């Protein structure tokens, strides 16, 4: 898009539109941030600072920090200082109570509900986001499993099934997210113990696998046994992805 040139040496692409959200999950890159870092000053001055950054994010960041409009033909009377980019502020997926954290932490409070029926429900008896404590694993055991969390998750899944009754749909009602494969296997094992065959069809996976899908209820098992594990969960775009994947309420 940016490099194509016409026979006259001018930009071959007169206008293009990119729609996305760089504050949600990026593409999966095997290298860590240090390995993909770019140190060439010429490239860094052009906005290319890390190979993990998408073209969308690089352009957005450049336009935010640039004092001049890179695309002068896109002048807007309503936003003269940001003529080449804007934000879509209406979301129709989450109830406002679920969206509140992501809205404040990632979008500066600018997200507004469309006003769809599931967003307008006002049930004072429902707490739409709940944080439950769990016991860490004993010293010397694997940091990538937590039996206490797995049992809690299985019990919540069973409660959700009982609450929904005949309307429970394993592919739409409930999803369980956790960062480690070992914890996924442990949660599935605990769910089988519940003796509810319908729960065997629910998706238990990492947040990357949930990208683009949604559920009424999301259970997030952090599986943090030691303080050092917190830095592995510090990717804010992943945490944002967890909230965006939820429709009605979240029960970690």
What are these regions (language model features)?
Residues 1-251:
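Conserved helicase motor core of SF1/SF2 NTP-dependent helicases
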